[in-house]
């Protein structure tokens, strides 16, 4: 059971509970048993699952709830809160600051994906405006420097290593000195891994750490080991002063939930998760938005950040103005498709859209979804400027549709499908009319200005129902931090699959 399946199973359990005519002990018990079964299949420790059930039952005491209380909403909120508690170590990790030199050392067992993760970490920060660099102090594994060199070259990140020197401490110090002179503000040191935890590995890590004095030591762990992650994370934390954890290989293994919860139990913060082999299949891990996306409710503040990353700053005010007007043209859709294809794995992006993850992209078929978007763009390439800029749906007559289909080499059905998708998105866009725009014109600040009425209009009816209507949304806002809308949006996941 991969994480998407885990989220689907929990969402279905909540949906079945919401659809019940009467919420009684039997319905609550069935819902909690389904959720517990899904968590156990994801290799979450039995004790953690049992404690979660106990805590939810303490919150949701059906006998003592006042008449007229929305039981569905209370159960959903309790499940959301307990899932967050299960994955939250309650301790923040060191965060590099742009322009201020930081040294980060990576440690982990061989085969965990440590070297690849070093490059992903560097690439992520490079896109955020940092000047990262990579140092290969792994002299144990044959080919380690070649791998780092290849990855770094592809990502256009400066690197340092040696084919001749066998002392990892000397290489680490030389690399550190070189990149400090070059004003790198994030120096990442990759260290040797072993097939198992052993004294020699920990001693080497200690020596490299002593010589380089890293601001943060990151432990890279294979997520497929499930709850065994607890012992591994604990051992590294005690021996290597680990300040944060990155969990890899969460894209196709059954035990990801177990690994995440086990690491949280050691009070070690998970800061990123690896969801594939490609350099952009790497996500920042923030508990509330993660649980929100897991349950199909999206992460709008995260989506705004992604849009800001790929959209030039001078285009953002123009897009926000169009959003405030509620005007959505085919040209605007085309531009957003272009941005969407730059944002990284399409499944990751769609999981941030509340209730819309399956509309454009069939579940688990990212390539099909990407191909569909490119097909739609090809169709729009055969449209006139008047057609692209029009907001009048009656403009698309049968003769125009036939002409567009011929010009793009597509079937008439493909053109009508694209137009239906456009109408659906335009309808959703129009509901945001009148939105107060951020004064600085930044997309990332937009989520703070969304009010309850606009959110209620924009959310699909079935998703809003899962949340308990407007009242549920308001209660959740309060739970997620009150006035800060971005925090609330980052973690409002309580519904549909």
UniProtKB/Swiss-Prot annotation:
This is Signal recognition particle subunit SRP54 2. HAMAP family: SRP54 (MF_00306). It catalyses: GTP + H2O = GDP + phosphate + H(+). GTP binds at residues 108-115, 190-194, 248-251. It comes from Hordeum vulgare. One of its GO terms (biological process) is SRP-dependent cotranslational protein targeting to membrane, translocation. It is an enzyme of class 3 (hydrolase). The keyword Disulfide bond does not apply. NCBIfam families: SRP54_euk. GO terms for molecular function: 7S RNA binding; ATP hydrolysis activity; endoplasmic reticulum signal peptide binding; GTP binding; GTPase activity. PANTHER family: SIGNAL RECOGNITION PARTICLE 54K PROTEIN SRP54, SIGNAL RECOGNITION PARTICLE SUBUNIT SRP54. Residues 1-295 are annotated as: G-domain. Component of the signal recognition particle (SRP) complex, a ribonucleoprotein complex that mediates the cotranslational targeting of secretory and membrane proteins to the endoplasmic reticulum (ER). As part of the SRP complex, associates with the SRP receptor (SR) component SRPRA to target secretory proteins to the endoplasmic reticulum membrane. Binds to the signal sequence of presecretory proteins when they emerge from the ribosomes. Displays basal GTPase activity, and stimulates reciprocal GTPase activation of the SR subunit SRPRA. Belongs to the GTP-binding SRP family. SRP54 subfamily. SMART domains: AAA, SRP54, SRP54_N. Its EC number is 3.6.5.4. Its main location: cytoplasm. GO terms for cellular component: cytosol; endoplasmic reticulum; signal recognition particle, endoplasmic reticulum targeting. It is found in: Cytoplasm; Endoplasmic reticulum. Pfam families: SRP54 (PF00448), SRP54_N (PF02881), SRP_SPB (PF02978). Component of a signal recognition particle (SRP) complex that consists of a 7SL RNA molecule of 300 nucleotides and six protein subunits: SRP72, SRP68, SRP54, SRP19, SRP14 and SRP9. The NG domain, also named G domain, is a special guanosine triphosphatase (GTPase) domain, which binds GTP and forms a guanosine 5'-triphosphate (GTP)-dependent complex with a homologous NG domain in the SRP receptor subunit SRPRA. The two NG domains undergo cooperative rearrangements upon their assembly, which culminate in the reciprocal activation of the GTPase activity of one another. SRP receptor compaction upon binding with cargo-loaded SRP and GTPase rearrangement drive SRP-mediated cotranslational protein translocation into the ER. Keywords: Cytoplasm, Endoplasmic reticulum, GTP-binding, Hydrolase, Nucleotide-binding, Ribonucleoprotein, RNA-binding, Signal recognition particle. Residues 296-497 are annotated as: M-domain.
């Amino acid at each position: 059971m991969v994480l998407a399946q885990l989220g689907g199973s929990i969402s279905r359990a909540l949906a079945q509970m919401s659809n019940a005519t009467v919420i009684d002990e039997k319905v609550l018990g069935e819902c909690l048993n389904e959720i517990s079964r899904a968590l156990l299949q994801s290799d979450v420790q039995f004790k953690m699952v049992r404690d979660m059930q106990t805590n939810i039952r303490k919150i949701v005491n059906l006998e003592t709830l006042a008449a007229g209380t929305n039981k569905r909403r209370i159960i959903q909120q309790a499940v959301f809160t307990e899932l967050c508690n299960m994955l939250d170590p309650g301790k923040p990790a060191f965060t590099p600051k742009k322009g201020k030199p930081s040294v980060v050392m990576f440690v982990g067992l061989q085969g965990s994906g440590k070297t690849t993760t070093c490059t992903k970490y560097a690439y992520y920060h490079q896109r955020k405006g940092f000047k990262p660099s990579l140092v290969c102090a792994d002299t144990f594994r044959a080919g380690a420097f070649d791998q780092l060199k290849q990855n770094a070259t592809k990502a256009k990140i400066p690197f340092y290593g040696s084919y001749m020197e066998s002392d990892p401490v000397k290489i680490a110090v030389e690399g550190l000195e070189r990149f400090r002179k070059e004003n790198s503000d994030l120096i990442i040191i990759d260290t040797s891994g072993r097939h198992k935890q052993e004294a020699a590995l920990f001693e080497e890590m200690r020596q490299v750490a002593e010589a380089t004095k890293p601001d943060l030591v990151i432990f890279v762990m294979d997520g497929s080991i499930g709850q065994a992650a607890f012992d591994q994370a604990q051992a590294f934390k005690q021996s290597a002063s680990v300040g944060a954890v990155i969990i890899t290989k969460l894209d196709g293994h059954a035990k990801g939930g177990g690994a995440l919860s086990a690491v949280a139990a050691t009070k070690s913060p998970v800061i990123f998760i690896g969801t594939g082999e490609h350099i952009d299949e790497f996500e920042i891990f923030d508990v509330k938005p993660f649980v929100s996306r897991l349950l199909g409710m999206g992460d709008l503040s995260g989506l705004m950040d992604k849009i800001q990353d790929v959209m030039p700053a001078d285009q953002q005010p123009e897009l926000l103005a169009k959003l405030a007007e509620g005007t959505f043209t085919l040209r605007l859709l085309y531009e957003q498709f272009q941005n969407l294809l730059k944002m990284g794995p399409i499944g990751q992006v769609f999981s941030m859209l509340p209730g819309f993850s399956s509309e454009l992209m069939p579940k688990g078929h990212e390539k099909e979804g990407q191909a569909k978007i490119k097909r739609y763009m090809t169709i729009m390439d055969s449209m006139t400027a008047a057609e692209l800029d029009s907001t009048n749906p009656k403009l698309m007559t049968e003769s125009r549709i036939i002409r567009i289909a011929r010009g793009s080499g597509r079937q008439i059905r493909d053109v009508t499908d694209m137009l239906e998708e456009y109408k659906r998105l335009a309808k959703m866009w129009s509901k945001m009319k009148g939105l107060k725009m951020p004064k600085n014109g930044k997309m990332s600040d937009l989520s703070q200005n969304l009010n309850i009425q606009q959110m209620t209009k924009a959310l699909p009816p079935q998703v809003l129902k899962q949340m308990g209507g407007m009242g549920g949304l308001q209660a959740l806002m309060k739970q997620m931090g009150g006035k800060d809308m971005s925090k609330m949006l980052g973690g409002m996941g309580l519904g549909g699959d």
